[in-house]
From Swiss-Prot:
Organism: Saccharopolyspora erythraea (strain ATCC 11635 / DSM 40517 / JCM 4748 / NBRC 13426 / NCIMB 8594 / NRRL 2338)
One CC-aspect GO term: ribosome
Entry protein name: Large ribosomal subunit protein uL10
Gene symbol of the encoding locus: rplJ
Subunit-level organization: Part of the ribosomal stalk of the 50S ribosomal subunit. The N-terminus interacts with L11 and the large rRNA to form the base of the stalk. The C-terminus forms an elongated spine to which L12 dimers bind in a sequential fashion forming a multimeric L10(L12)X complex.
Keywords: Ribonucleoprotein, Ribosomal protein, RNA-binding, rRNA-binding
Keyword Ribonucleoprotein: yes
Cystine crosslinks: none
């Protein structure tokens, strides 16, 4: 790779580190090109999966202020740069690694700090943002309905009591006639 190409590659990787919400470092030793294409499709539009030379990635990480990942850049390295919610991409990587033993998740970077393999897997086990928001909305609606029923209960009881008293009075008046 010529020097200008290396400079461009470092700049591009540094830019990806800066714009991504998370990055997952993987080893892809033994994956065919067809499998890499399949993985890229599984990751979706919000994630860029890039194979890169370790020295260039180290320089790019240093340039963008990313620290603590140097030990991950050993062997054939590819990085999934995730823009947006990291849950779906982490799920896709975990599933793909389960089906293809040649893909090894080494760790990653999120919220300004390195994350371990177990943290990446924990993120993959989370519900997506949409599912979590749906659960929250459902719980809030149930609590609102419960609160409305509690507030309406005294008024309903008072109305029933008034109706019972009125029936009793009307019943008492007809007996007196």
């Amino acid at each position: 790779m010529a020097k200008p190409d290396k400079v461009d590659a470092v700049t591009e990787i540094a830019e990806r580190f800066n714009t991504s919400t998370a990055a997952v470092v993987t080893e892809y030793r033994g994956l065919s090109m067809a499998k890499l294409v399949q993985l890229r499709r599984a990751l979706g539009e919000g994630t860029t999966y890039r194979v890169a030379k370790n020295t260039l990635v180290k320089r790019a990480a240093e340039q963008s202020g990313v620290e603590g990942l140097d030990e991950l850049f050993v062997g054939p390295t590819a990085i999934a740069f995730i823009e947006g919610e990291p849950v779906d991409a982490a799920k896709a990587l975990k599933e793909f690694a389960k089906d293809n033993k040649a893909l090894v998740i080494k760790g990653g970077y999120m919220d300004g700090r390195p994350i371990s393999v177990s943290e990446v897997e924990s993120i993959a086990d989370l519900d997506s943002r949409e599912v979590t928001l749906g659960k929250l909305a459902g719980a809030m609606k149930a609590k609102m309905n419960q609160a409305a029923a509690l507030f309406a209960a005294p008024a309903t009881k008072a109305a029933r009591l008034a109706a019972a008293l009125q029936e009793k009075r009307e019943g008492g008046e007809s007996d007196a006639s």
